[in-house]
């Protein structure tokens, strides 16, 4: 007996079939940094952001596929334990806050037909498209009064009638087959093929965002199958991300925004009697069609690949925060005056910023004990009901001990502070999608002094808070969390205690089966953007000696005096060999 769940299964030996047919399967992003999209500037400074790449497949044995789809999903997650206290008895009450929703989705229905992706969630017109397509799909189903939807609603899903319908539709779904070229292909092999059928299929199923394959009402989706022969395939994909797309947030313990790709090869197993095909001379290049009623399929072969994508944002070069110096100072009457400063409010993650402290004592017997600095990270998150949860933690603390003796004059102290270089320990400053997640930082400085009064030392404490804007810079070494995927449902897991370097420019050559050459799948190594050289290191602008006059390579000219100029003018009037003037005889 058939059941409803058996229709969506991927076959009894899907993993074995996957190893037999596909030797390499990967998603590659066109970016100078591996699996990272780096956006420079704020959403107000940018237009749409291009995203492109290639789906790389190395086919070991021939495989028949219905389509090769790709999906990019961004998910917002809240999960933490909120603890509240009563004032009367100081008892605590804990409640679990948990929420997970999709904030971005882009879908490529079939990369064999089109490389352009459709933004379904998170785009400018995604919500309107979703509502309109949902209305169309609902109306089409209601109008089909003689179809299977209304008929099956009156029957039990486990009834023999239902199983008979399933068996008949499974065995009678005939399609034509298109054969791809030998040794693989680079590009979209059947660009624009049945584009109308593809658009109807994707629009009528926009409601079901959790399904892994879109299809028409008859369950076929398209009337074509594709035969992929042994070889290497590069299928391009591209789309435009909205400028306000949220950044990846992976370091906060209570909330996150994570992006992941999911590529699916929707394979089919053919009946033995339908394995022979013949070439169609009038079809597209490399296409074949079957005789009779076409190809018949019986089982699905689903092959999945997941890829973690980081979308990070950095500051533009003309951001005012880079040139803004932060200084905090105050005066204690009859005691001292102090000033604490950092050269720039914008500090890249993984760098070291100098903290300058100046103390002007107004009386004797004051000495500096130590300087304590702490980097405070404030973060706030908002759930679907607009409830805001905020907290702050000390990301890093350092202490500088000092023994300068009694302060008798101005004291200048330079205390370098190093920002952590991994995105698990610290999160960049951000304000995402109507305060969905907001992160800010400040540097807290405590100056501990001792003042001698009547032979005893009393403690003096100076507190200063310097606002900082922490941003991501690709020019500094940085680390992120190691991501692992559940091979069945694509759930993201972070391996505790392990980090991976970011902003790598090369792809590892792992996963390639020996004997299978990938001729066109090598990703170009793009050079990192370098800052301009210092002036004394310039090679195009040649420096001139300070005492060398302008035009040093030209002949030195001397200016004659007035008498010399008059003598030269009178001598030139008696030059011999000159042509006489014309005179008229009349």
UniProtKB/Swiss-Prot annotation:
Residue stretches of biased makeup (Polar residues): 126-145
Glycyl lysine isopeptide (Lys-Gly) (interchain with G-Cter in ubiquitin) crosslink residues: 364
Keywords: Endocytosis, Isopeptide bond, Ubl conjugation
InterPro entries the UniProt entry points to: Arrestin-like_C, Arrestin_C-like, Arrestin_domain-protein
Ranges of biased composition (kind: Low complexity): 199-216
GO cellular component, one term: plasma membrane
Pfam families assigned to the protein according to its UniProt record, in alphabetical order: Arrestin_C (PF02752)
Gene3D superfamilies named in the record: 2.60.40.640
PTM comment: Ubiquitinated by RSP5.
Signal peptide feature range: none
Region annotation Disordered: where it falls in the sequence: 123-145, 182-217
GO MF, one annotated term: protein-macromolecule adaptor activity
Keyword Cell inner membrane set for record: no
Cross-referenced SMART domains: Arrestin_C
GO annotation, biological process: ubiquitin-dependent endocytosis
PANTHER family documented for this protein: ARRESTIN DOMAIN CONTAINING PROTEIN (PTHR11188), ARRESTIN-RELATED TRAFFICKING ADAPTER 5 (PTHR11188:SF62)
Subunit structure: Interacts with RSP5.
Anything else known: Present with 1970 molecules/cell in log phase SD medium.
Family: Belongs to the arrestin family.
Function field: May regulate endocytosis by recruiting RSP5 ubiquitin ligase activity to specific plasma membrane proteins in response to extracellular stimuli.
Protein name in UniProt: Arrestin-related trafficking adapter 5
Gene (name only): ART5
């Amino acid at each position: 007996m058939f059941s409803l769940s058996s229709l969506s299964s991927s076959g009894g030996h899907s993993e074995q079939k996957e190893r037999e047919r596909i030797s390499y399967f990967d998603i590659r992003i066109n970016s100078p940094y591996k699996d990272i999209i780096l956006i420079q500037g704020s959403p107000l400074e940018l237009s749409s952001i291009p995203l492109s790449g290639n789906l790389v497949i190395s086919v070991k044995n021939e495989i028949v596929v219905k389509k090769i789809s790709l999906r990019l999903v961004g998910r917002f997650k809240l999960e933490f334990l909120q603890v509240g206290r009563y004032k009367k008895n100081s008892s605590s009450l804990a409640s679990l806050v948990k929420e997970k929703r999709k904030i971005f989705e882009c879908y490529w229905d079939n990369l064999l037909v089109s490389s352009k992706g459709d933004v379904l969630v998170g785009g400018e017109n995604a919500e309107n498209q979703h509502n309109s397509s949902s209305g169309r799909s609902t109306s089409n189903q209601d109008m089909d009064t003689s179809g299977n939807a209304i008929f099956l609603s009156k029957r039990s899903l486990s009834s023999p009638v239902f199983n008979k319908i399933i068996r008949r539709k499974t065995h009678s779904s005939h399609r034509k087959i298109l054969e791809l070229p030998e040794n693989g292909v680079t590009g979209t092999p059947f660009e624009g093929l049945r584009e109308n059928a593809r658009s109807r299929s994707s629009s009528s199923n926009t409601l079901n965002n959790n399904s892994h394959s879109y299809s028409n009402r008859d369950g076929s989706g398209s009337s074509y199958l594709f035969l992929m022969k042994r070889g290497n395939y590069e299928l391009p994909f591209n789309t435009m991300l909205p400028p306000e797309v949220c950044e990846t947030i992976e370091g906060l313990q209570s909330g996150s925004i994570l992006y992941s790709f999911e590529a699916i090869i929707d394979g089919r197993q053919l009946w033995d009697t339908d394995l022979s095909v013949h070439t169609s001379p009038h079809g597209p290049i490399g296409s074949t069609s079957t005789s009779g009623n076409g190809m018949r399929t019986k089982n699905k072969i689903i092959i999945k690949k997941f890829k973690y994508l980081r979308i990070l944002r950095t500051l533009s070069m003309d951001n005012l925060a880079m040139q803004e110096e932060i200084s905090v100072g105050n005066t204690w009457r009859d005691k001292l005056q102090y000033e604490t400063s950092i050269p720039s409010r914008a500090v890249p993650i993984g760098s070291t910023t100098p903290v300058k402290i100046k103390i002007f004592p107004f009386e004797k017997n004051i000495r500096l004990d130590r300087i304590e600095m702490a980097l405070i990270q404030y973060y706030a998150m908002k759930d679907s009901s607009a409830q805001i949860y905020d907290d702050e933690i000390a990301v890093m603390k350092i202490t500088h001990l000092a023994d300068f003796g009694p302060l008798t004059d101005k004291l200048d102290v330079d205390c370098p502070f190093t920002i952590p270089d991994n995105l698990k320990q610290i999160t960049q400053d951000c304000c995402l999608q109507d305060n969905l997640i907001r992160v800010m930082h400040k540097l807290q400085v405590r100056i501990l002094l001792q003042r001698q009064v009547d032979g005893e030392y009393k403690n003096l404490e100076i507190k200063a808070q310097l606002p900082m804007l922490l941003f991501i810079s690709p020019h500094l070494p940085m680390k992120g969390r190691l991501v692992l995927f559940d091979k069945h449902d694509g759930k993201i897991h972070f391996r505790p205690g392990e980090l991976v370097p970011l902003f790598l420019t090369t792809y590892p050559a792992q996963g390639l089966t020996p004997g299978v050459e990938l001729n066109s799948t090598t990703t170009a190594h793009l050079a990192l953007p370098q800052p301009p050289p210092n002036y004394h290191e310039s090679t195009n602008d040649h420096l001139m000696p300070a005492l060398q006059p302008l035009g040093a390579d030209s002949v030195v000219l001397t200016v004659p005096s007035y008498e010399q100029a008059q003598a030269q003018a009178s001598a030139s009037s008696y030059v011999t060999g000159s042509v006489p003037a014309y005179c008229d005889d009349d």
